[in-house]
């Protein structure tokens, strides 16, 4: 959520910056609402002052024994109270209208973000590794997994439906090995604290990280909306679309000491997404699932440190790919392809041989103070009384299923077996090939 002053005193400049990412801010409506708000604010304050002044006169009239005057003043005070209540209600309604508009406004892109309309105008900044040239016909991960009876899409369809998977034997073990390897790397070498978090979260948490109110259709929600347990209404819960939600919300409504910053947290969780806008896309294989595992990286920093932290966090995700010896490229998203709450985002795209292209495997973003303002996540500098908003960052380190896709396809052999990357073998009890 943007600073409200940007939508009051810097409206035209803010609209211009938002236009860079293809968002049209309704300047005229906001300006009119703000003028009405100011007028009502003044009226409310005047009515409050009049009521307070007249209320004091009641005691003075009674002290003089003029009860008739006291009654008349009390009637005036009651009328002023009614007017004040009406003005306050109108002011609250106006403020809610302004807030509703503000909640639909995305973050402002950083000046370093390239201009562009969509993903075709993202800018490649690095390419690591060289895709192998195979002397045999390359198979995709679906064929490789089904040949080895390690990926069972048919059973998943029977149990749950499309966009789910059952993994078996060494394929399930490889999936587990990947997540263990990622967690060990991030906790032992990159300085993150491992977290175990709920997979069901409340609306306040989803609001804090920006999924609500705008992206509710992308989530899986529990039903009914509320239920009574011991006379206490429970809020509707939703399955997490990413561990970013529960992990980042650890700092909601808190004030962190400057000495404890930055906070660096990681969590391995399943993620659940409805893929509401992805009908017909990536219907084959593990690329786009309703349920998938991911190791998430979250950093909570001081404002002046967040851009350097984005480079660091992205580097931590890159290290996973490098140790797995998977060719990838790094792109900075253009203004038209950025996520709703992002100030700046890097995508890491891994080489997928069967598709002969790079596919996203990690997205690393600096959210600036956008989430922090919603969450009231703050820190206090040493010697200062007033707390400041933190900056929040998050990124995949990595998506486990897509990493598995990359390993199956990049490490396939002519006979259909899969070589296990060297760094994973200790997690596989020394197994060198599967399939």
From Swiss-Prot:
Q: Give the pathway.
A: Aminoacyl-tRNA biosynthesis; selenocysteinyl-tRNA(Sec) biosynthesis; L-seryl-tRNA(Sec) from L-serine and tRNA(Sec): step 1/1
Q: Where in the cell is it found?
A: Cytoplasm
Cellular component terms (Gene Ontology): cytoplasm
State what protein this is by name: Serine--tRNA ligase
Cell wall biogenesis/degradation keyword on record: no
What family is reported? Belongs to the class-II aminoacyl-tRNA synthetase family. Type-1 seryl-tRNA synthetase subfamily.
| UniProt lineage | Bacteria, Pseudomonadati, Pseudomonadota, Gammaproteobacteria, Vibrionales
Domain comment as written in the entry: Consists of two distinct domains, a catalytic core and a N-terminal extension that is involved in tRNA binding.
Q: How does it assemble?
A: Homodimer. The tRNA molecule binds across the dimer.
Q: Which InterPro entries match?
A: aa-tRNA-synt_IIb (IPR002314), aa-tRNA-synth_II (IPR006195), aa-tRNA-synth_II/BPL/LPL (IPR045864), Ser-tRNA-ligase_type_1 (IPR002317), Ser-tRNA-synth_1_N (IPR015866), SerRS_1_N_sf (IPR042103), SerRS_core (IPR033729), tRNA-bd_arm (IPR010978)
GO molecular-function terms, A-Z: ATP binding; serine-tRNA ligase activity
Record-listed L-serine binding positions? 242-244, 296, 396
What Pfam families does the annotation carry? Answer: Seryl_tRNA_N, tRNA-synt_2b
Q: Which reaction does it catalyse?
A: tRNA(Ser) + L-serine + ATP = L-seryl-tRNA(Ser) + AMP + diphosphate + H(+); tRNA(Sec) + L-serine + ATP = L-seryl-tRNA(Sec) + AMP + diphosphate + H(+)
CDD domains referenced in this protein's UniProt entry, alphabetically: SerRS_core
